[in-house]
Amino acid sequence: MNVDCIVVGSHLRFDGVWQRPQQLLTRLAARVPVLFVEEPFLASDDRDDLRMQGNVTVLRPLRAEHAAVADAETVASTRAWIGGRRALVWLYTPMMLALADAAPGAPIVYDCMDELAAFDFAPPELRARESDLLARACAIFCGGRSLFESRKYLGARVHLFASGVEFDHFARARTIAPHPLLTDLPHPICGYIGVVDERIDIALLETLAARACSVVLIGPIVKIDPATLPQRTNVHYTGQVDYADLPAMLAGFDVAVMPFARNAATAYISPTKTPEYLAASVPVVSTRIADVVASYGDVVAIAIDAESFANAVMAAKDTPPERVAAGVERARDVSWDAIVERMWVTLEGE
């Protein structure tokens, strides 16, 4: 596959929580120019804001009123950016399929990182749009084993590329001082890094917060009422923290947690934070998420309910050093650099 540029359509903001899209695309941008197209953003006037963020060009459609995702103006701006180059269309959401109109005949990659139709407030037409995208994509990359299993019936176009880790970045947690936000908190400190939304088990958090520990949730609260979250004095919500500061946060954790609910929104998740936690040499406790059990069940403590989760957190100090070391080595084996290289080789064979 010969391409001169990549056009990306994403439901996530490029300057949001640093995760799979940013990790992959900043690396792909070292090979060819990348345009990252976001969903519309309400503003006082209609225009397409185009700016460089690192080595990626970000197009944010600003609209004075509600507009369709990837509307005609966005498609026109994308077409102008492409110019006469050979483009690859790379989508994270089926709702952006119209971006393909900016480059008729261009190959399409669907990097499927979540079962978006199962999320709260998903557009009712999303499933139909995904059917169209699955039919048109030359390659379907799945960010986890469960997503792969649900789509492998489509044949050789479907590839498993579970999320990786920037190992050296997170391994710094072993050698640096804890973040100032954590230095005065009583131990043990159990921490979560990521979006706080409908995937979090609020009742489980309440059970955990009743124990003698500090609970720290690092990330934006979205799609849920913050008032429904535990409001105890030992529970702390920091909001989003810069990616550069995450190792210092992990340096202050006694245990890292994944307190996910068991619901439709979590049935197919493969949390990027798993190898990030492990690379930091922190004991990890998770609820019974299928992909975590399948890929990391031997190095992550898996809890079946709220009480066993809280018990595992409080017992984390007794985690055998061999288990922590094995988790570190597991994380070392799944670098983003290696994943991007394998993706590129796969596309060259298409």
Predicted regions and their residues:
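Nucleotide-sugar-dependent
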Residues: 15-19, 200, 244-249, 256-279, ...
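Conserved donor-binding/catalytic core segment of Leloir-type glycosyltransferases
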Residues: 182-199, 205-209, 215-218
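Conserved acidic donor-binding segment of nucleotide-sugar-dependent glycosyltransferases
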Residues: 298-307, 314-320
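Carbohydrate-associated surface elements
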Residues: 146, 161-173
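A charged, aromatic-enriched C-terminal amphipathic alpha-helix characteristic of glycosyltransferases
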Residues: 318-348
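Membrane-proximal helix-turn-helix segments that form the acceptor-binding/catalytic region
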Residues: 123-140
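Nucleotide-activated donor-binding/catalytic signature segment of Leloir-type glycosyltransferases, i.e.
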Residues: 219, 224-248, 348
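N-terminal subdomain of nucleotide-sugar transferases
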Residues: 1-43
